């Protein structure tokens, strides 16, 4: 039995049947939904983190690949949490982890898988290398998850007061048809506003009339009520 198999068994021991029944509805894995066919065993994220703490040092990347290619959602999510930990703890070159992450992006195919890994790995790498070309490449792909990966990765930049790449990518996919992009764009704009309300309002004044309503609502959530209403009613 390899380490990946040990992790699968450990996760199975933590499975909660009620969660296994609920997660497919929550993560939209039904027929015709964005995560159609995804399978769940019902392991919560806090329980997955217990597994990560125990196994992140033990499992090599080649076995992590097996876990990340699994049809079971919690296997993939745990694999990504392990990869984040490996990246954060790495004392030498992290290029191998970046290559691994991008080589497996086809399996990073739901919003939680994207959001809980991309900015901590890809975003940090791009910020520290001062090279955002991979984010621009991802934002140009047709795949929904690649586009979301690109914009959410800029969270690392935004939290450090660097807004330009985020604004550029938001505008590139401002009117994407899927609400998961509308929400992601609004979320990142709101994060910018948490650091600089002036930057947020300046951006919104230039573009709010062109953005989806969901994006606007997410972006203005933390503004005072009068300002929110002015944006919603088109008075600015």
Task: Give the predicted meaning of each segment.
Residues 1-236:
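Alpha-helical scaffold domains
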């Amino acid at each position: 039995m390899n380490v990946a198999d040990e992790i699968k068994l450990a996760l199975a021991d933590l499975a909660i049947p009620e969660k296994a029944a609920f997660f497919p509805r929550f993560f939209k894995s039904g027929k015709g939904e964005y995560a159609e066919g995804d399978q769940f065993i019902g392991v919560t994220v806090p329980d997955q983190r217990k597994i990560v703490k125990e196994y992140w040092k033990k499992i090599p990347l080649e076995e992590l690949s097996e876990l990340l290619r699994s049809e079971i959602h919690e296997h993939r999510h745990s694999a990504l949490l392990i990869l984040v930990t490996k990246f954060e703890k790495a004392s030498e070159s992290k290029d191998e982890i970046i290559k691994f992450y991008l080589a497996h992006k086809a399996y990073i195919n739901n919003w939680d898988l994207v959001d809980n890994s991309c900015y901590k790995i890809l975003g940090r790498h791009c910020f520290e290398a001062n090279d955002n070309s991979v984010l621009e490449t991802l934002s140009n792909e047709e795949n929904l998850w690649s586009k979301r990966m690109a914009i959410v990765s800029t969270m690392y930049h935004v939290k450090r007061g660097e807004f330009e790449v985020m604004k550029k990518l938001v505008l590139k996919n401002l009117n994407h048809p899927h609400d998961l992009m509308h929400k992601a764009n609004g979320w990142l704009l709101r994060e910018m506003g948490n650091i600089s309300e002036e930057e947020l309002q300046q951006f919104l004044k230039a573009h709010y009339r062109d953005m989806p309503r969901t994006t606007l609502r997410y972006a203005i959530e933390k503004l005072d009520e009068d300002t929110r209403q002015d944006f919603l009613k088109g008075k600015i």
